[in-house]
Amino acid sequence: GHLGHRLLFLHLENENESAEAVENRLVRMITEDRDYIEKLSICRNAVIAFFQNIQARYPNGVTWNTAMDNPRAKQIIVRAALMLKSLRGTIDPKDATNTIFEEPTRLTQSFYNICRGHALMHYRTHIIVNDVESVLTIMLDSAPPERKKLLLTLLKQNGEIDADQYVEISKHGHKRVLDEFNDFEILNIVEFIQDNSMKRIRLKPEFSWLLNKKILKMIELHN
């Protein structure tokens, strides 16, 4: 329905690890590593210790100080939710006007809760801009992979790219690239701009906040 997905994703990847390194790591895991029960116990004890620490610090429970929340952080949370809403839109192949977008309320609340969890880990009961870094990563990782790839490329190209450029970068065929461009227009992420006979897209103004230097730096740390 329009309420949207209940799941958000965070990809944990180590793309720089060679096949040989992966093999060696897995061999060590089954020959030298702790067994599953011991690992489970270590993780369980770490989680219990964390919550005991929080409980000791806030014996009467955590009272969230919303008045101290950074307004800029809240703005980024809302904008990230609206961005993911567009990235996850479901396009009707027979009628693009029937594209379904999720209601961003749930996304906004989920992102806010993630930021609050990060703040609490640093013993704060209010959020600051640094807390939104994980939300930006989750925003991208929760999008379909090819849409994430096109958006990241747009950001690296300062918000504009033409079809030939993206064919070269993505290694996709020209028709597929044009289809992806059209999808982004349907999803209200980009607009087509005049560039002689070349198809060229530009990030819509409502998403230009992603081109902010601090935002880009946060995104680049995880991509």
Which role fits each region the language model picked out?
Residues 1-135:
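Phosphate-sensing "switch" segment of ASCE/P-loop ATPases
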Residues 103-106, 171-187:
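Short amphipathic alpha-helical interaction segments
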Residues 121-122, 155-158:
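Short helix-capping/hinge SLiMs at alpha-helix to coil transitions
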Residues 129-151, 157, 173:
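Short alpha-helical segments that sit at the start of domains
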Residues 130-134, 194-209:
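Accessory beta->alpha helical hairpin/"wing" motif in late/C-terminal subdomains of nucleic-acid enzymes
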Residues 140-143, 205-223:
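Short, amphipathic alpha-helical interaction segments positioned at domain boundaries
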Residues 157-170:
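Short acidic, hydrophobic short linear motifs in intrinsically disordered regions
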Residues 185-195:
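A short, conserved structural fragment
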